[in-house]
Amino acid sequence: MRNFKQAKRIVIKIGTSTLTTTDGVNSAYIRTLAAQVAYLRQLGKQVILVSSGAIGMGAKRLKLTGPVTDMKMRQACAAIGQPLLMHEYHKAFGEAGMIVSQVLLTAEVLNHRKSYLNLRNAIEQLLHLGIVPIINENDCVSTAEIGTAFGDNDKLSALVASKIDADLLIMLTDIDALYDKDPRKYKEAKPVHFVEEITEPLIKAAGGRGSAHGTGGMKTKLQAASIAS
């Protein structure tokens, strides 16, 4: 769908790098996001958020520096950061007159029909009640080793969008566009304004992980777009 006005159900994915700063959570950004979601709801849109940030916020609360790569430490950071993340959402969205809900997922939920249908029914009921569902991977228990991890929330957002019949998937990032090469490394990088086909050379040019505490980047966003389309 290319006509935004016709989109009724919208999934918005927010990455770690847009939610956090070097000092901690970006509260101003979350308030701005809340205002924008409130506006979309006034237009009759249903909005579902897929939010990263738990590991990053947990790491900052523990005053960790650099990427958190140890699995046990990532799980600990997620357990610490998830309630901090939801507190920020509750506060900002509450000030904008909205109620939010937390939905934590593992890959198992979407891979089994019964649990998937239970999830879908829950989200449908939340939307019916006018609640904004905020979905995140349950990083405290999701691990690639036991096959319960999505890998990144870009992929999760695409899967959620397809499973709940969303009309539009928006992925927010701190990079202003897709480039033909990493603009943080190459000054001559040029923006790619429209992608008709997701090719291997394009994915390769998109680079790797986006932030120290996140798992996504432009590469995973292209892969997510491929899933969603």
Go through each PLM region and give its residues.
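Nucleotide/pyrophosphate-binding catalytic subdomain
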Residues: 1-229
